Amino acid sequence: MKSLLILFAIVAVVAAFPELERERRGVIAAPALAAVPLAPTIALAAPKVAPAIALAPAPKLLAAPAVVAAPGPWKAW
């Protein structure tokens, strides 16, 4: 049910604005970025950020799934 609500919200946002208005607001960012003269600068800056994110250590909670398990008679939601 949540996924249906999210899908409806996305369709409503896309249908609410004409195409040029969506580009101006950034809802469809790819055509708008292609027209901006700074697009090559943005494209070159992205790979510098990506390796830092890839090298970040994973949180400890993700490595221990037993912490998430429900104890005893409790229901796991």
Curated annotation (Swiss-Prot):
GO terms for molecular function: carbohydrate binding. Residues 1-16 form the signal peptide. Induction: Expression is increased following microbial infection by A.apis and P.larvae. The keyword Nuclease does not apply. The keyword Phosphoprotein does not apply. Expressed in the epidermis, hypopharyngeal glands, fat body, trachea, esophagus and stomach. Its main location: secreted. GO terms for biological process: antibacterial innate immune response; antifungal innate immune response; killing by host of symbiont cells. Antimicrobial peptide that binds cell wall carbohydrates of microbial symbionts and induces structural damage. Binds the cell wall carbohydrates mannan, N-acetyl-D-glucosamine and lipopolysaccharide. Can target fungi, Gram-negative and Gram-positive bacteria. This is Apidermin 2. It comes from Apis mellifera (Honeybee). The gene is APD2.
